Swiss-Prot record:
GO terms for biological process: hydrogen peroxide catabolic process; response to oxidative stress. It is found in: Cytoplasm, Cytosol; Peroxisome matrix. GO terms for cellular component: cytosol; peroxisomal matrix. It comes from Helianthus annuus (Common sunflower). This is Catalase. Homotetramer. Its EC number is 1.11.1.6. PANTHER family: CATALASE (PTHR11465), CATALASE-2 (PTHR11465:SF23). It catalyses: 2 H2O2 = O2 + 2 H2O. Belongs to the catalase family. The active site is at residues 65, 138.
Length: 492
């Protein structure tokens, strides 16, 4: 075999998927899990390689959420939820915790206008007495996909064409035509709320399902929701074009100027909880990030308030070097087996190490404000002053000991390791319900945006037909209206 014949080039692409080392990949859609809903296994080398490779594609700009603005403030507990969690920073009403928050757009570059139709990031870093807690979410409560295996592909489809560097609807429509679970997210993105007026007037959500654990060790699934006290306001197309044309940094400036003027943005934090023992009663999977939890069944419970009362001192140090990761939690809060969350746990820290270096948590914006100690030494850009002689554990010469044990979810797992989809997909019910909740004029604007994306000349008749079928399954009249405007026959 000529070792140079198949040098790295797209001219020598294999007809099937492989790893970087050339091994065949038989499933490029699902992660390797314990059973259909269990945790993802680290031995899924293809997943790890795929995510690790993806995390290193751009430097030094964030691969997503590149365009952002930050501010500092505090979180104050207003309601007692100690029956649900033993988290120290939630121990009693009145307790305040310093925070730094970063808002962002998701897909577009660092200098792009803040008036583009795009999800918005809403990430909060709590500097607690028991270490940092990063609640890394968006302004929408759902996401496009439910398995992180598809995250690199999803972002690639939303990013500009690699040949022309132009974002094109035909690529987006093609990719998501393979993923009907994305419909719910599109009912948010293509709705009137798809372009927030600014960062102060938008909701926030933890998006993923986490777990709360109380002192007795009882666990509850939890969703986090931020609600702005000044209300939600959005821009329609004409307004967005006008504002973005005049100032491509209007949301950043609005946030900065409002805080400087003493008009401090504020959000209320609410949670929804589900007893894991009762999840089988639902017609959806509570660990499915493409679903919301009905508020009439799982009401919003108030927790506290977030106030941003101080602008950052340096954009590079407290925005570009500010790094979040869903893996950073505190006692009383834990992960769930949400497949997207499980992959975010790895991917976020990995991309920060790539972007900022292995010691990114030593940077002032990312470092905990409480005492901390471990044997993680040296590495690139290590600037922590250390004079210990003991860099191992245990030792009779160093009094450092284990921390007191705290409760974690008491979960037993069994199942066949496999790459598979969840059992309760139920992709169309919630998108249909959300569409029917819109007023007639709001429905019309939504339909116009859907049709606009599908009207790209390179969107094939096959892809249009698939989308008409999807929207028809969500709501028959919606599918008929889209089909009529696209001249596509509905296929029920």
């Amino acid at each position: 075999m000529d070792p140079y014949k198949y040098r790295s080039s797209s001219a020598y692409n294999a007809p099937f998927w492989t790893t970087n080392s050339g091994a065949p990949v038989y499933n490029n859609n699902n992660s390797l899990t314990v059973g259909s809903r269990g945790p993802i296994l680290l031995e899924d080398y293809h997943l790890v390689e795929k995510l690790a490779n993806f995390d290193r594609e751009r430097i030094p700009e964030r691969v997503v959420h590149a365009r952002g603005a930050s501010a500092k403030g505090f979180f104050e507990v207003t309601h007692d939820i100690t029956a649900l969690t033993c988290a120290d920073f939630l121990r009693a009403p009145g307790v305040q915790t310093p925070v730094i928050v970063r808002f962002s757009t998701v897909i577009h570059e660092r200098g792009s206008p803040e008036t583009l139709r795009d999800p918005r990031g809403f990430a909060v870093k709590f500097y607690t007495r028991e270490g940092n807690f990063d609640l890394v979410g968006n302004n929408f409560p759902v996401f496009f996909i439910r398995d992180g295996m598809k995250f690199p592909d999803m972002v690639h489809s939303l990013k500009p064409n690699p040949k022309s560097h132009i974002q094109e609807d035909w690529r987006i429509m093609d990719f998501f035509s393979h993923h009907p679970e994305s419909l719910h997210m599109f009912t948010f993105l293509l709705d009137d709320i798809g372009v927030p007026q600014d960062y102060r007037h938008m909701d926030g959500s933890g998006v993923n399902t986490y777990t709360l654990i109380n002192k007795a060790g009882k666990a509850y699934y939890v969703k986090f929701h931020w609600k702005p006290t000044c209300g939600v306001k959005s821009l329609l197309e004409e307004e967005a074009i006008k504002i973005g044309g005049a100032n491509h940094s209007h949301a950043t400036q609005d946030l900065y100027d409002s805080i400087a003027a003493g008009n401090y943005p504020e959000w209320k934090l609410f949670i929804q909880t589900i007893d894991p023992d009762h999840e089988d009663r639902l017609d959806f999977d509570p660990l499915d990030v493409t679903k919301t939890w009905p508020e009439d069944i799982f009401p919003l419970q108030p927790v506290g308030r977030l106030v941003l009362n101080k602008n950052i001192d340096n954009f590079f140090a407290e925005n570009e070097q500010l790094a979040f990761c869903p893996a950073i939690i505190v006692p009383g809060i834990y992960y769930s087996d949400d497949k997207l969350l499980q992959t975010r746990i790895f991917s976020y820290s990995d991309t920060q190490r790539h972007r900022l270096g292995p010691n990114y948590l030593q940077l002032p914006a990312n470092a905990p404000k409480c005492a901390h100690h471990n044997n993680h030494y040296d590495g690139f850009m290590n600037f922590m002053h250390r004079d210990e002689e003991i860099d191992y554990f245990p030792s009779r010469y160093d009094p450092a000991r284990h921390a007191e044990q705290y409760p974690i979810p008491p979960v037993r797992l069994s199942g066949k390791r496999d790459k598979c989809v969840i059992e309760k997909e139920n992709n169309f019910k919630q998108p249909g319900e959300r569409y029917r909740s819109f007023s007639p004029d709001r429905q019309e604007r939504f339909i116009n945006r859907v049709v606009g994306g599908l009207s790209d000349p390179r969107v094939t008749h096959e892809v249009r037909s698939i989308w008409v079928s999807y929207w028809s399954q969500a709501d028959k009249s919606l599918g008929q209206k889209i089909a009529s405007r696209l001249n596509v026959k509905p296929n029920y």
